Amino acid sequence: MALALLGLTIKPEHVPEGTGKAVADVEALACDPAQCMRSCPFNPFLNQYGGICKNGQCVCVKPS
């Protein structure tokens, strides 16, 4: 039983480091660019809604 628990603790640590793809997929799913843009205020300078996905989070771009 201890070996099974050890296997479970080692596997998650090595999977994201191996390819990096799993981490990127999770971040991409965490923030939908189209939904992010619509959820932010309209930016008249860019003539669009100002929101970008950054590190899996929606960040509203404020007009400067």
From Swiss-Prot:
Would you say which domain of life the source belongs to? Eukaryota
One example GO MF annotation:
toxin activity
The protein's UniProt keywords, in alphabetical order, are: Toxin
Misc? Since this peptide has no sequence signal, its secretion is unsure.
What does this chain do?
A: Insecticidal toxin.
Tissue specificity of this protein: Expressed in fat body, but not in cephalothorax, silk gland, midgut.
- Name of the protein described by the UniProt record: U2-aranetoxin-Av1a
